[in-house]
Every structure is written in C-alpha cells, then in structure tokens.
C-alpha cells in the first residue's frame, strides 16, 4: 500500500487519508489474527509508553496497556493524582519531559487543545484516547467490527447514529464514514445535531468518496434500510448532573429499540462504544430509574442482549486497533 505513518501522532481522523485509515484497519486485523492464533508479536521490545488519563476509563486503558505489553513495551499509567500536568507544570513542559523518557504518549482528557499541545511539544508520537471533541481510536474498533460483519465490504453501507449527535463519538463516526465511503445518518433532536464545523468538513470528503451525510429528526427515516445502528450514552463524562432531566426528555424518543432494528436491514447490527445504560444494574442506572422512572436509557436491554448486538466484539477490537495505532508510528 506504500503508507508510512512513522513518527506521526494520532489526534483526529481528519488528519488521515482514506488509504492511511485502511492501512491501520488492515494492520489491526493482522494483530487480531496473531493474537487469536497465539503468535507472539513483541515487535517493539525495549520501547516504553506513558498513558495520561484525566478521565477514567475501562476499555481505553486496558486496550492500551495490553496492546503495549503484547508488543513488548513497558507501560506507565498516570491518573490525575499521579502527575503535575496542568497544576504545577504546564502541558508544554510535561510534554517535553515525557518525550525525553518515553517513545509514545497516550492522552485521555477534556480539551482537544491539550492533546495537540502534547503532540506539538513532546517530540514523540501522541495518541488521542478521547477528548471532548474527538474519539478516533474508538472509530477504528467500530469500523473493524463493521468489516467483520459485512465480509469487509463496507463502502456504500449506511451507518445511523441515534441520540446526542453532537458528542465526540458521533462527530468522529461522521468523519470515518465520510473517509471510507459509508453513508452517515445523524438522528436526534434539533438541539443535539452535529455542529456546522464537522458537517462542513465532512461533506466534501463524503462527496469525494461517493457517500452521503444526512441529518434527520425522523427515527423511521433514519433506521429504514440501515446496515448499522449506533448509539451512546445521553450524558457524557464531565457534563453536570443537572443536564440529565433535559437529556432524558429530549432523547427518550431516540432510544434504540427492537422496532428500530426491525426497520433496518435483516442483517443490520447494533453498536455502542460502552458503557451502556440498558438496565438498572449500575449505580447511575438505578439512581436515574428511581429519579425519572426509566429502566433503560439509550438502548433497550432486548436490543443490547440480542444477536444483532456486536458491542463486545467492538470492545475487544479496541485492543487490536489501538495496537495498530501504536505500532505504525513506532515500528
């Protein structure tokens, strides 16, 4: 393919060409095949990475840690209480220190400007594990899952995002669909539609790759003939508790139900980046059930637990795709 990502940071998918994204996906598949076959792939022995987390995580942290160790690298995890970044030491200075000690830096936090500042100053590749604006590593896992379920023929497929279409996952999903030639449909209330910045950036990319971007408030219009129906939590990390009541009122009509899946193609799949509020078996789920009288939020338990739900394949694929994201610039 002739793609070279050596030394590059992975901050948002708009920075990468279609060919580069396809290369990372092919690499991810290779790593998954090796992992499944028990074939060692410690190609980065002797290198070290640091994981900077301002926001808590299960999948992102585990995927980076296991992925790095599988590749033979040493890993340091720094949570907000373990580093002076942004408190006693600027992000610029932190980047310059860590860049002297580590071969790569992962950042999961709030501002996109922070991860870009790290990348500008570290002198080593920096990987965006999530910011308020973008979630690029999640997208590779999502697309690998779509590929696996549609015999790697994804061009022309239709991906629907239901709910808060302005969040980091929905924005990133629009980008990756446009880059890879999949039709993208954002379905939610007017106040939860994606911003003009991402729509304007993606529209010409989609046109170039022969696909479309659609914004709609109609669940029926969105779900009819869909190949993939995707949703995410209604309130994102870092948002105040006060928004719950408004979000539930706004987004309840956009819950993914069996009726939604029935409108989609017979082979359609359901995706969710997790964690999901599909029952009351969590502290927050139980609390909101008592407060608002709902036992399911963005997706029904029936859909979540159905054969069409590929959410745990998707979660596993975080590890294989993140491995590719680390390996490509460090090999």
Where are these regions (language model features)?
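Active-site cofactor/substrate anionic-group-binding motifs, chiefly glycine-
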Residues: 48-101
């Amino acid at each position: 393919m002739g793609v070279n990502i050596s030394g590059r940071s992975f901050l948002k998918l708009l920075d990468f060409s279609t060919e580069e994204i396809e290369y990372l996906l092919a690499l991810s598949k290779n790593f998954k095949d090796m992992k499944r076959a028990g074939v060692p792939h410690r190609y980065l022995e002797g290198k070290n990475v640091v994981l900077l987390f301002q926001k808590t995580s299960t999948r992102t942290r585990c995927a980076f840690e296991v992925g790095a160790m599988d590749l033979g690298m040493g890993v340091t995890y720094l949570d907000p209480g373990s580093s002076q970044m942004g408190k006693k030491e600027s992000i610029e200075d932190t980047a310059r220190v860590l860049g002297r000690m580590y071969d790569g830096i992962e950042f999961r936090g709030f501002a996109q400007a922070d991860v870009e500042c790290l990348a500008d100053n570290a002198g080593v590749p920096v990987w965006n594990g999530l910011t308020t604006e973008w979630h690029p590593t999640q997208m590779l896992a999502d697309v690998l899952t779509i590929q696996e379920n549609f015999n790697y023929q994804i061009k022309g497929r239709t991906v629907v995002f239901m709910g808060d279409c302005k969040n980091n996952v929905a924005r990133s999903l629009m980008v990756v669909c446009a880059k890879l030639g999949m039709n993208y449909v954002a379905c939610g209330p007017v106040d939860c539609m994606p911003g003009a910045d991402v729509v304007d950036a993606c529209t010409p990319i989609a046109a170039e790759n022969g696909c479309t971007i659609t914004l709609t408030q109609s669940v029926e219009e969105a779900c009819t003939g869909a190949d993939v129906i995707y949703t995410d939590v209604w309130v994102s990390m870092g948002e105040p508790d006060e928004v719950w009541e408004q979000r539930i009122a706004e987004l309840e009509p956009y819950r993914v139900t069996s009726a939604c899946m029935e409108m989609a193609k017979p082979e359609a799949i359901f995706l969710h980046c997790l964690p999901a509020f599909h029952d009351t078996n969590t502290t927050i789920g139980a609390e909101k059930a008592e407060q608002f009288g709902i036992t399911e939020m963005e997706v029904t338990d029936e859909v979540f637990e159905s054969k069409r739900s590929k959410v745990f394949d998707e979660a596993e694929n975080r590890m294989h795709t993140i491995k590719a994201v680390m390996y490509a610039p460090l090999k």
